[in-house]
Amino acid sequence: MTILSGKCLCGQVQLSVRGEPLRIGICHCTDCRQESGSAFTFFAIWPIKRFEHHGEIAEFDGRCLCPRCGARLFSFDDREAEIKLGILSEAPTPLTPTYELWVKRREDWLNPIEDAEQYEEDRW
């Protein structure tokens, strides 16, 4: 089974996920842009049973981050964990987005991801 791991900028928070993700996406919504400080967020979703994290975390509006370095890390509930893929130790990652959200907010200079589903807003 594949194991991917990552950590925050200062190394205080570590995480790992096992197996293939349920889905892999890119989001261009205003919240993701502001939260990441970039034009989009690259993330994947795993079942909560295949996700582990260690170290002290802080939370804002359901999003977990390192209280020391401020790195945005993940969010989770009792079913799933959404991991910010930029924090994985392996770069580039072996993961390819299968969908894009909020493409109506995508920068004009960014091309759609080939073969990925495109959603004007959310998937539902």
Regions found by a protein language model. Give the residues of each.
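A short Gly-Trp-Pro
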Residues: 1-124
